[in-house]
Amino acid sequence: MSEQKLPLKISDLLSMTFPQNSFWIEPAILPKGGTLLFGGAAKTGKSFIMLELARALSTGTRPFSSSIFSVPGKAKVLVIEQELGERESQSRYSNLLKNTRPSAYNDYLYNLSKVPSMQLNSNEGLKYLYDAIDHVQPNVVILDPISMFHGFDENSNTEIGDLFKRLEKIKGAFSHLSLSLILSHHFKKPSVGPYKTDTLSPYNFSGSQRWFNTPDTLATFHRGKTLKDKSGWFLDSRWIPRMGKQLDDITFLIRPEDEDCQVQVHSGGGDKDGTCGPTTLGATSASSKLPFVVSREREREREID
């Protein structure tokens, strides 16, 4: 039988002390040992936001070079994605993290692409994830999209509850790393009718209510207008941390082919600058179907036109 927690006296609870630095991303966006869930329709640009968070964590710099968010210190990040593959992942990292010094941030950013056997409803799939984490020893793992990491019924509270329990066990096994998870999940198809809907509501998550009841923080996204020159689009977002104050809605500007600034804050959230700032990346292969390290460093000093 696993070790069970016992009830605490309130006096003992009140006397407990907690570390000051309890979050990988502030303000209260990604708790150490917690879970952040992204949500939105396909092709909105969620992956660009996730990669920017990975960049910021692995380099210890502000996400989006924005005054809204901060990273108290560097964290080792493992990105596991099921859709792009290594060729497209290389292209995205290369575009996002131009002008690299390959040795600048070695051992802080890793990628693992297209591992269909990593199915968390099976013991073999769980072991695959465990082994990948054990190989890298990351502080943060990104699973994108979570729907391709399991064979559970996404509409079942029981089965999705089981999925989150399995993820909690994984985090518990690496508690010495303060392991946190960032997951991406899809929204259900928008309803058709005369009434205007809240496109950023967490109730838009497809499937079981466990998707939006269980994580520590929810981040929802909706694609806005495309730029006139077709070079990018606006991306509305809402960040809902359970451990802190909800931010004002934030709109990002996504420019996938812009080598100087792929993602930046356009408006909202109380941002004081919204410019692009320092970033970097390069990649060297480690071993077949084990995560490989991604290193980066570059200068970005460009404001939105």
Language-model-detected regions and their locations in the chain:
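Residue-level signal for alpha-helix termini/capping positions
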Residues: 59, 134, 172-176
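Short gly/ser/thr-rich secondary-structure transition/capping motifs
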Residues: 16-23, 123-124, 199-203
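Conserved alpha/beta core segments of nucleic-acid transaction machinery
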Residues: 242-305
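The Walker A/P-loop phosphate-binding site
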Residues: 2-98, 103
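Conserved inter-motif catalytic segment of the P-loop NTP-binding fold
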Residues: 71-158, 165
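Phosphate-binding/switch region of NTP-binding enzymes
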Residues: 37-38, 43, 47-48, 77, ...
